[in-house]
Amino acid sequence: MGPFGALCLAWALLGVVRACPEPCACVDKYAHQFADCAYKELREVPEGLPANVTTLSLSANKITVLRRGAFVNVTQVTSLWLAHSEVRTVESGALAVLSQLKNLDLSHNLISNFPWSDLRNLSALQLLKMNHNRLGSLPRDALGALPDLRSLRINNNRLRTLEPGTFDALSALSHLQLYHNPFHCSCGLVWLQAWAASTRVSLPEPDSIACASPPELQGVPVHRLPALPCAPPSVRLSAEPPPEAPGTPLRAGLAFMLHCVAEGHPTPRLQWQLQIPGGTVVLVPPVLSKEEDGGDKVEDGEGDGDEDLPTQTEAPTPTPAPAWPAPPATPRFLALANGSLLVPLLSAKEAGIYTCRAHNELGTNSTSLRVTVAAAGPPKHAPGTGEEPDAQVPTSERKATTKGRSNSVLPFKPEGKTKGQGLARVSVLGEIEAELEETDEGEQMEGQIPADPMGEKHCGHGDPSRYVSNHAFNQSSDLKPHVFELGVIALDVAEREARVQLTPLAARWGPGPDGASGARRPGRRPLRLLYLCPAGGGTAVQWSRVEEGVNAYWFRGLRPGTNYSVCLALAGEACHVQVVFSTKKELPSLLVIVTVSVFLLVLATVPLLGAACCHLLAKHPGKPYRLILRPQAPDPMEKRIAADFDPRASYLESEKSYPARGEAGGEEPEEVPEEGLDEDVEQGDPSGDLQREESLAGCSLVESQSKANQEEFEAGSEYSDRLPLGAEAVNIAQEINGNYRQTAG
């Protein structure tokens, strides 16, 4: 037993050693198996790892893809470290087998799409590190199966928003890192502000959980967001034409339109869901385009052959069709950019439930309408009878079919904005929008235009039976009642639109097939068409069927300053009445603004310039003068007066102590010779001469200025008996009575 047991032990140890791959180091400590494969430059998860490994470190490698089944043999792993491993892709199901996983580190990688569904099997997970990746979204239910998760780190990613209630299922969460994500702070993120203020979860760096957009909130922390005007969507659904009563079937062959109006903030996104006999159809309206040159928004779409996919024509000005009369196939449904849904031709195939769904960041709302279509009946007249369809229709039924058109104008509400009385829409580039009349060939004409409706003979240079040219209405926007044989009136020609009105037509409308004007087409009413063509010829730009009871038609999307012609004809025949007109030239709005601004600027500047010139002329002197001061030779008398009245000399004399008359024996004090004073001055500093000259010049200037005042002149004159300030009567006692002493010049 001893040798056999030792052999078994050696074999077991050898098996364990062989179970660890060569680049990795496997260590068994504390009843846990550690597999260290970090910093080995591995490109794949190594195979042959021990089945009982509990901690697997694959950090700092080059494993770009975590493939499905990579951990199928190590299902007992509780800690998986994959940081800094350049992981880009995690295949779905790669982590789902690790049901005992508690710690998962996928930080500092390049993961943009993560299989969040794998976390549903990791109910024991306690630590999840997904920071420093490229995650762009976090589904609301991604963390719903992690009740034991304590630490979640999803900072430094590309998260722009978080769904409300994302962290509600994390009852054990105590640490959450959300900072350094480019959050879009809108109504969808308001809940995070309230949650962060009330939660007990630790949120490091709250000021770094900030907004990256919109620009006005960039850099604002989420917990300091201002109040935002938010409202969930509300939906209103209406039909045109509206049903007379709920559940009333609509007549087949009508053009049916549903208008869906959704309100909310942010602006809700719309979606149509149609439950029709052929199945369920989902339509998403196109994004509303910006206003074009003419200021009109795109309203109508044009099919591209697919019955269920809506399309939209975005050309501001219609272009001639490449080939006529082959029109493009009309789609069954058109989802318009303004939220409306158009059914060009209603039939039993379009009956069903129409649902408009609106969604924004705060929720979803929807409303539905059931549409029923009446079954098509037999023909209302026998072929070859020569009777019109409406001749045998009862009066009550005829009134019901023409309800709302008693004023001979079909109400029309353009998409977006409506002004004044509406007109019947005109088809653009072969698009059928007018209601099809019921004829004996109605079943064959559904979704098609009449054969050869706009050939070259309608808009070319051929000789029609009658050609009328009228340009009078171009000179004014007033109605010009120029009535022609078939009653054509053109009015309100603008830069990009023209309205054409037809007077009531006579019973015998146009010639018959044999050319006789009095003949009537046997079996059916003649199909009347209205074309808009370039005046120089070519294929028609727009056309419309002349409907019974509709006498006004609106041509839009025209080119400014272009010649057009309106042609009134029968189907398949040449033009019988043609009116030529020109659209007005469009004056650029910028030019008008600049012109008016320049005019107002000139009007306001000219008076100011005139006033400024008058002010300058009034202030301008007649002859300029300049004051010139020239030095003059000092006058001897002025020199003497300046010496006698020198305040410094007076001050020196006052400081001397004179003896009393009695004590001095009545002797007069000796006078200091003036020559001695002059010599002292001359022997002094040369700067004294300069100061003396400056003082003399100043005295002369003062005297010249004092001449204007007689009193000042007398005070400064040598003939004045007033004593200057500082002079003593003792020194000038001899000169009081006019006994002036002559001094040597």
From Swiss-Prot:
GO terms for cellular component: cell surface; plasma membrane. Residues 290-328, 376-423, 654-697 are annotated as: Disordered. It comes from the Eukaryota. Residues 181-232 form the LRRCT domain. LRR repeats lie at residues 52-73, 76-97, 100-123, 124-145, 148-169. Residues 317-328 have a biased composition (Pro residues). The chain crosses the membrane at residues 590-610. Residues 233-372 form the Ig-like domain. Residues 1-19 form the signal peptide. The keyword Ribonucleoprotein does not apply. InterPro entries: Cys-rich_flank_reg_C, Ig-like_dom, Ig-like_dom_sf, Ig-like_fold, Leu-rich_rpt, Leu-rich_rpt_typical-subtyp, LRR_dom_sf. It is found in: Cell membrane. Residues 665-683 have a biased composition (Acidic residues). It is a single-pass membrane protein. Residues 20-51 form the LRRNT domain. One of its GO terms (biological process) is nervous system development. Glycans are attached at N52, N73, N121, N338, N365, N474, N563. Homomultimer. Interacts with NTRK1/TrkA. Required for axon extension during neural development. This is Immunoglobulin superfamily containing leucine-rich repeat protein 2. It comes from Mus musculus.
